[in-house]
């Protein structure tokens, strides 16, 4: 029977983020609409539609794909020395509960299964995975083996239900896992079906037979089909191209250059060692029609530089000061002169370097703020328990 995986899987991010590597995507079950009432008569093989759905769902719970990631169910299995899980626990799982909560009905359906995966206890109140069917170790080798027998199919209506897709999968021998691929829709804050699925077959030959069929039509739509490994490789290449294009675009757009006015630096000497930068500014700003942009001066020194905001302002400023002497305080005057070309170049280079560092710091600070704002440290968010999706 097919194992069911209807999911907001990690691949739901693919529209906006680049995967680190091609990977077999894990999934969790979500809510499902209740299937229509089963037909009274038995279908081919002696199963009603309701029985098939119950068997399919329970065997999914105990199947390889689900047990490898379902921590809650593994915990329930571990509570009993022999691995029995009470049916009363299983019927709390949303999808099984949507089919039936009648324990006798579930047991009766499972008694008809020929898979031999699930065993029923003598009192008919508990189930377990058959001891002769141990869970395969989930490692890199196993991941690749699963990927090699998984197909990708696209073209399903966006409003498709999991039950409809399972009915579709039942036509092919033999699908053991079906993943509905979804994306997160921001306006509705919900996961929506993308119209494509992954089908994992029991063997690679079965997957190959599905892919090699000349044409498969679902509800008058021809499906696009390919190996999952090929699909993931194409996506990786697509992401790499997008990133390269984005990188090239960024490199093609140079950072705006910092330009400072020329001939705007006045060098002063004769300041008392106790002078502060604020006092220097106050003295320079007494000369009207000139604006101070930056002062390079450290307390304890007697010499420094003042950059004015406009080009060619240095000579004009000095011309307004009597004999090149700027009154400071306590009858102290500062001797002024225009900076030499070498001094000006050194001053401007240092100023531009400082401005670049400040710009980079501000930009990185903004990025850090946005990461925190949008949940960059996911492990620190959400103190409550995560609801179990079954």
UniProtKB/Swiss-Prot annotation:
Subcellular location field: Nucleus
Signal peptide: none
MF annotations from Gene Ontology: 5S rRNA primary transcript binding; DNA binding; mRNA binding
Ribosomal protein in keyword set: no
Biased composition (Basic residues): 362-374
Chain ranges of the RRM domain: 149-234
Matching SMART domains: LA, RRM
Domain xRRM as annotated: residue spans: 259-386
Predominant location: nucleus
Keywords: DNA-binding, Nucleus, Phosphoprotein, RNA-binding
Cellular component annotations (GO), alphabetically ordered: cytoplasmic stress granule; cytosol; euchromatin; nucleus; ribonucleoprotein complex
Protein name per Swiss-Prot or TrEMBL: La protein homolog
Organism: Drosophila melanogaster (Fruit fly)
Gene: La
């Amino acid at each position: 029977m097919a194992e069911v995986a209807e999911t907001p899987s990690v691949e739901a991010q693919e529209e906006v983020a680049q995967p680190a590597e091609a990977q077999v995507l894990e999934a969790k079950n979500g809510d499902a609409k209740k299937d229509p009432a089963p037909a009274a008569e038995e279908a081919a093989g002696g199963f009603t539609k309701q029985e098939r759905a119950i068997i399919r769902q329970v065997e999914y719970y105990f199947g390889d794909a689900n047990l490898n990631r379902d921590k809650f169910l593994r915990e329930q299995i571990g509570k009993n020395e022999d691995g029995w899980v009470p049916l009363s626990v299983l019927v709390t799982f949303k999808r099984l509960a949507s089919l039936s909560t009648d324990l006798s009905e579930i047991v009766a359906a499972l008694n008809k299964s020929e898979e031999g995966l699930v065993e029923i206890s003598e009192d008919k109140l508990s189930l377990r995975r058959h001891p002769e069917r141990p869970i395969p170790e989930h490692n890199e080798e196993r991941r690749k083996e699963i990927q090699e027998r998984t197909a990708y199919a696209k073209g399903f209506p966006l409003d498709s239900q999991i039950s409809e897709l399972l009915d579709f999968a039942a036509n092919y021998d033999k699908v053991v896992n079906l993943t509905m691929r979804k994306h997160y829709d921001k306006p509705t804050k919900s996961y929506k079906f993308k119209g494509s699925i992954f089908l994992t077959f029991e063997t690679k030959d079965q997957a190959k037979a599905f892919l090699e069929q000349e044409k498969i039509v679902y509800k008058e739509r021809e499906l696009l089909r390919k190996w999952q490994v090929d699909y993931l490789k194409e996506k990786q290449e697509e992401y790499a191209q997008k990133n390269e294009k984005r990188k090239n675009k960024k490199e093609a757009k140079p950072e705006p250059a910092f330009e400072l006015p020329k001939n705007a630096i006045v060098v002063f000497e004769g300041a008392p060692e106790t002078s502060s930068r604020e006092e220097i500014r106050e003295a320079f700003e007494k000369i009207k029609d000139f604006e101070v942009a930056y002062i390079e001066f450290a307390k304890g020194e007697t010499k420094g530089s003042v950059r004015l905001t406009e080009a060619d302002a240095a000579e004009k400023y000095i011309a307004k000061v009597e004999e090149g002497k700027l009154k400071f305080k306590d009858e102290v005057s500062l001797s002024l002169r225009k900076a030499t070309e070498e001094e000006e170049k050194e001053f401007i280079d240092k100023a531009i370097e400082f401005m670049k560092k400040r710009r980079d710091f501000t930009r990185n600070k903004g990025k850090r703020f946005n990461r925190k704002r949008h949940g960059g440290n996911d492990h620190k968010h959400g103190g409550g328990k995560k609801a179990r999706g079954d």
